Structures are given as structure tokens and as C-alpha cells.
Amino acid sequence: MKYVDFDNLDELPGRRLAETETFTFDCFPGISCFNRCCRNLNLFLYPYDVIRLKNRLAMSSGEFIDRHASVVLRPGGFFPDVLLRMQDDREGLCPFATPEGCAIYGDRPDTCRKFPMEEGVRYHPGAGKTERIYLFRPPDFCQGPRQARTWTPAGWAQDPDDAAYDRLTLEWAELKVLFLNDPWGREGPAGPKAKMAFMAVYNIDRFRDFVFNSSFLKRYKVQALLVKKMEKEDVDLLRFGFDWVKFLLWGIRSEKFRPR
């Protein structure tokens, strides 16, 4: 989910859709373009994507990032993007694509769930709220839009897990927008605070070790029930991490914890 600037809204590629506006699309084995969209991708991974994928593959978050992700700080950016690493061959195929389809379909990333749409978020600073932007943007080779099934952006999410992906990706987008301005000062985006922030949102297993095996709980008073949940539940720990990063970098307080 990308941040959308008010000034360049009309320049965004694709067809902008209202939440209840219709589009036609279908995808299935046997369609002539099947799996072509799984090649040569800049496929962004969001924090919840990493949680689902590392659990699906039975590895730690750090191991998943090392094996399957590229961490890229773009020029002028203040927080790195995490992208799924494609296979190192001419086709650049997704490592989880098979002739039958996606090998990790139940845990596929949010971007894949939204395809052929792209979602953006526009932040209204005066009102303190965000607005969803929907863009219908299938690639030129895609035959999906020529099929008969009709959808709306609001009805496109059909998998039972889509709501969890949607909610956590939006929460991440609302945090990520704060990084439009430099929070690092002299430390820069490779300094200690930057490494801590990245750990809290992307390397969830290392963050759990930090919370429970350092002086963290001596320095912060955390709700007792939440502490128990965070020991085992990745999602509770991730949402705590979002709030902790806001406090660490911008002093935004949370009801979940306070300094002792």
C-alpha cells in the first residue's frame, strides 16, 4: 500500500475506482496468461506478509529476510522497502510460483491478494485520517479484464484472511507515512534507532527476543495481559511494535505501555 500525494493524484497510472465502482476480472488455470504476472516483479512485502510467510515456511523472520527478501533504501527515503527476491534466472520467476499456481496461496502477500488492483493511502493531516485510493492496473498481457465476472473494490477481497491483511497493512501505512520526514537526525537511516525500528516491524522474532530477554520490560511498564499475548502471538507483538516505534521516534504515547 503506497502513500499517495495530493499533488500527483491525477498522474497515477491505472484507472482510479471508487469503492463501489465495478470492474471485470477473473483468473484461473487455463487462462492464456496464467502465472505470467508472477515474473520480474518488484513485489513489496509488508510486515504482516513477512509474519505469514516465515510461519508458512517454518523459519524465523530473520532467516526469511536473509533468504527471500531484498531490503532497499531508496534515494531520498528514510525507511527501507522490503521486496520479495525473485529467482535468479532470465524469467525472474517468483520462488513460490508453480505450473499449477501459487505454492503458498493461503499465505500469499497482500499485494498478490489485491491484484489486479493497487491500493494507496492518502493522508489528511488536518483531519488526522487516511483515505483509500483504488487503482485498477492489470498489465497489458493480462486477459483477466476480458472475463465476465464483475467486482467492486469493496467486494474484491474474498479470502477469509483478507480482512487481517487489509487491517494490518493499513496500520503499517499509517505508520510509514510518518517517515516522509527524516526522523533520524545525525544518526542517519543506518543508525541505532533505524535498526531498532526495522527490527520492531519486520524482524518480529528478534524483536520478541529483545522485549523478553533484555531490560525492556524493566524500562517500560506494559499491560500484563498484553505481555502474555506477545510471548506467543506475532500479531499482538507486531501491533505493539508499531506503537513502540511511534513512541521511540516521535514521542507518540500509547495506552499499551509507558516508561517506568
What are the residue ranges of the model-derived segments?
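Short loop/turn segments that flank or connect secondary-structure elements
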Residues: 1-36, 42-45, 49-260
